[in-house]
Amino acid sequence: MFDEIRPTRVEVNLDSIVHNFREIKRVVGDRVKVMGVVKANAYGHGAYHVAKALVENGVDYLAVATVEEALELRSYGITAPVLILGYTPLSQAGEAVEKDVTFTAFDLKYVKELGEIASRKGKKAKIHVKIDTGMGRIGYTDFDLAEREIEEMSKLEGIELEGIFSHFATSDEKDKDYAREQFERFADMLKRLEKRGVNITLKHIANSGAITDLNYAYLDMVRPGITLYGSYPSNDVNKILDLRPAMNFKTKIVYIKEVPENTSISYGRTFITKRPSKIATLPIGYADGLNRLLSNNHEVLVRGKYVPIVGRVCMDQTMIDVTEVEGVEVGDEVVIFGEQEGKRITADDIAKKLRTIPHEVYCGISRRVPRIYIYRGEVFDVKNYLKI
């Protein structure tokens, strides 16, 4: 299927993402809104397609990392509220104001200038104020300053103070003491603002780890990221969601050769055959997202059998040992992660080998890998980023 695109491709099952979203809604309840995090091209899954599916199924808000990501969604006709989680330079704010994008704010001078930009356009800039309760990134750490400046922000022309938020550093770890401290700091900030008569509609701090483990932190809205895509943030959280991985990473065998014992494979001769072997070449490498650290350190699926990567992963090609695979042929499907004949390899499995997190595995799949989208049980689109 889809012979007109590269043998190396990703299949994204949007039905799985919708299922995961509904699982999150089931856990947090109808009172709590959901902000679907689609930054970094929806963790490599495709921001537009994921956002569209989430909006069609009732997500309340979307979140991205940069102004460019927000404007990309607007260019595709996504009209749902979109929060830029990171800093937006004022030099880039004008179009975002026009397109009703929501800004993260943590400085009064910045917000005043943003309000002036919005007023000149006859608009109000919507902001969510960021409080750093212990992550160590952007956001107010001086709470006395924060409450004074936020009160002033709430009175500015050209500004709509819609939200306030923070981010957990350790919600996915076994020890929840630090996460609890962070929440208490955030709750203290909210009380201070209430005393000043500052009413803020959306208060949010719960990421994926907090959704599973810290139900007291749900507040008005939760911000699932990795759980939308079918992975837990760590092995230490409660597995209360029926998650379905949404991505399959696949390629095909393009060449098979039989080699004798003592044949070296790939750069550096890190693998030398110990027997007469069948070695298959795959048109996939670290430039596609198959990490070089998986050299001699990962198995893929061919005809329902686990077979090893042999030798170093190259930039564009990789070799596997298919000696034990009966009837193997050029053109056979190879699963890097995903399912085949009832067997599964997950992004989480790969992340463990790389001593990282599944987020990085998903995000590492490059733009030269086409995405095939499945929605409502059917293939409905193919995205080839390199097609002109």
Curated annotation (Swiss-Prot):
The pathway to which it is assigned is:
Amino-acid biosynthesis; D-alanine biosynthesis; D-alanine from L-alanine: step 1/1
Enumerate the residues binding substrate. Answer: R137, M315
Family, according to the entry, reads as follows:
Belongs to the alanine racemase family.
- Isomerase as a keyword of this entry, yes or no, is yes
**What is one Pfam family matched by this protein?**
Ala_racemase_C
Q: Give residue numbers for the modification (N6-(pyridoxal phosphate)lysine).
A: K39
Name the reaction it catalyses.
L-alanine = D-alanine
- The species is Caldanaerobacter subterraneus subsp. tengcongensis (strain DSM 15242 / JCM 11007 / NBRC 100824 / MB4)
The organism's superkingdom is given as Bacteria
Sorted alphabetically, which keywords does the UniProt record give? Answer: Isomerase, Pyridoxal phosphate
GO term, biological process aspect, one: D-alanine biosynthetic process
Q: What does this protein do?
A: Catalyzes the interconversion of L-alanine and D-alanine. May also act on other amino acids.
Instruction: Supply the InterPro entries for this chain.
Output: Ala_racemase, Ala_racemase/Decarboxylase_C, Ala_racemase_C, Ala_racemase_N, Ala_racemase_pyridoxalP-BS, PLP-binding_barrel
Q: Where is the active site?
A: K39 (proton acceptor), Y267 (proton acceptor)
What is the name attached to this protein's record?
A: Alanine racemase 2
A GO MF label? alanine racemase activity
What Gene Ontology cellular component terms go with this record?
A: cytosol
- Name the Gene3D superfamilies for this protein: Alanine racemase (3.20.20.10), Lyase, Ornithine Decarboxylase, Chain A, domain 1 (2.40.37.10)
Q: Which cofactor does it need?
A: pyridoxal 5'-phosphate
- What Enzyme Commission number(s) appear in the record? 5.1.1.1
PANTHER family in the record, alphabetically? ALANINE RACEMASE (PTHR30511), ALANINE RACEMASE, CATABOLIC-RELATED (PTHR30511:SF0)
Q: What is the lineage of its organism?
A: Bacteria, Bacillati, Bacillota, Clostridia, Thermoanaerobacterales
